[in-house]
């Protein structure tokens, strides 16, 4: 919870989770207290928290939805296609609807984006930690990227110490991964531009910036 509070104090409005949503069991002690903390929406209905919500941004209603992909993922995961359709059919309408699709398979991400092209404002892929270069606005107006990328250590393997990942990959032995806490940092993100009146998505642009430790 202290990490969540720190992010919110930095000016972050919404935090979306992914397949490791339950890695720290303590999250279930406070997840219902924060409307801005979204776990995947297509989990079993008994799991605490929510995965979609509307936020007011200077009078503009922005819905953010967090979903898990089914391809190569473990656990009980409901169909993400049905889940989005239910949101569109039964939930309150918003001016802008951004979907964070946390999944392994690029094909599944493309399929979901094309299936709801023009019905959601943006589908932003996450999970692989590596930013892709396929950002675009689809024919009917939905912004898309297969993976936004990560924020973390630049000289690492997906944010963890290189030596540990190499050992596990080489020998197959179990290894406890540790995050790199010092050195240059990588900041990955995207910027979405919307029309002020129609809320049509005009563009999506990636940010991929390496920041030296001395600049932090």
Place the predicted regions along the sequence by residue:
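Acidic, metal/ion-coordinating pockets
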Residues: 1-216
């Amino acid at each position: 919870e202290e990490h969540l509070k720190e992010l919110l104090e930095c000016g972050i409005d919404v935090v979306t989770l992914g397949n490791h949503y339950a890695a720290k069991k303590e999250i279930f002690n406070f997840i219902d207290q924060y409307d801005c903390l979204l776990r995947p929406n297509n989990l079993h209905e008994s799991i605490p928290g929510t995965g979609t919500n509307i936020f007011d941004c200077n009078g503009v209603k922005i819905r953010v939805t967090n979903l898990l992909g089914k391809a190569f993922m473990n656990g009980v995961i409901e169909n993400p296609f049905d889940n989005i359709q239910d949101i569109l059919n039964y939930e309150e309408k918003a001016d802008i609807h951004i979907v964070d699709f946390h999944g392994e398979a690029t094909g599944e991400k493309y399929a979901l984006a094309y299936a709801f092209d023009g019905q959601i404002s943006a589908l932003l892929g996450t999970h692989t930690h590596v930013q892709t270069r396929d950002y675009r606005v689809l024919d009917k107006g939905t912004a898309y990227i297969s993976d936004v990328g990560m924020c973390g250590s630049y000289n690492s393997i997906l944010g963890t110490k290189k030596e540990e990942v190499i050992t596990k990959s080489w020998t197959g032995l179990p290894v406890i991964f540790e995050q790199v806490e010092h050195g240059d940092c990588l900041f990955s993100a995207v910027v979405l531009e919307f029309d002020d009146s129609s809320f049509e998505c005009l563009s999506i642009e990636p940010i991929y910036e390496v920041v030296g430790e001395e600049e932090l």
